């Protein structure tokens, strides 16, 4: 029998959170918040495709509230999570649900989130694997593998020459090692998304330097 390996007790019992299930609420909040960070703007419409277990229990376990809360930028312990749908409505964000109770999704707690406004659309697939832990498996049709258990920097920027060099130079100045980097773009010269996993949890000074780089729209750091 294969043994399961956990990095900490929180992989088993989950984080401090609002809601009954770390998989269906805490993980869902984290997925939504990651998608919000990648999008980097106020959305006008968000479509949630829910598969298998997510689809069957999304209302009873509060997965719907958790996903929307994440899109609104809330954390797992935010007391406003039960009101997230109301808050989204007040902000003029249209929420659409696509329920797929039976599918061939590789994990039962899978969602594909499509976020739109007048300028752009992105699509992200994420899974909640337990204890509030998540994996991001697809971004705009590109297969990626991010577990978000390591410190991660998400940068939205204009697709211009030298951007990768500017960012890596900023990290190098503070002796921050890059473990993995994924870069995708809408098309040449348009907005691009850079997702960087690093070995250090102390990146605040480097992040401030990165924010000063021209043609950069949004930077978020997840410890």
Segment roles from a protein language model:
Residues 57-65, 110, 191-197:
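Short glycine/threonine-rich loop-to-helix capping motif typified by GTGT followed
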Residues 9-13, 146-149:
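Gly-rich Lys/Arg/Thr-decorated short loops/hinges at beta-loop-alpha junctions or inter-strand turns
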Residues 1-9, 40-44:
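Acidic-glycine-rich active-site phosphate/pyrophosphate-binding loop
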Residues 14-32:
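Conserved phosphate/anionic-ligand binding catalytic regions in large, soluble enzymes, centered on
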């Amino acid at each position: 029998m294969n043994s399961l390996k956990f990095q900490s007790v929180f992989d088993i019992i989950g984080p401090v959170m609002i809601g009954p299930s770390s998989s269906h609420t805490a993980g869902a909040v984290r997925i939504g918040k990651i998608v919000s960070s990648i999008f980097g703007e106020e959305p006008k419409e968000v479509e949630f495709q829910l598969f298998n277990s997510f689809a069957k229990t999304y209302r009873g376990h509060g997965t719907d509230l958790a996903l929307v809360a994440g899109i609104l930028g809330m954390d797992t312990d935010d007391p406003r999570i039960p009101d997230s749908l109301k808050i989204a409505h007040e902000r003029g964000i249209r929420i659409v649900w696509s329920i797929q109770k039976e599918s061939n999704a590789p994990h039962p707690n899978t969602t594909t989130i499509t976020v739109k406004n007048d300028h752009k659309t992105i699509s992200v697939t994420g899974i909640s694997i337990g204890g509030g832990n998540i994996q991001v498996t697809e971004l705009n049709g590109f297969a990626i593998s991010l577990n978000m258990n390591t410190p991660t920097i998400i940068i939205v920027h204009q697709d211009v020459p030298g951007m990768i060099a500017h960012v890596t130079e900023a990290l190098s100045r503070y002796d921050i090692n890059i473990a993995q980097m994924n870069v995708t773009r809408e098309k040449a010269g348009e907005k691009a998304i850079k997702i960087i996993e690093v070995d250090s949890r102390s990146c605040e000074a480097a992040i401030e330097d990165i924010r000063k780089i021209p043609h950069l729209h949004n930077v978020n750091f997840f410890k």
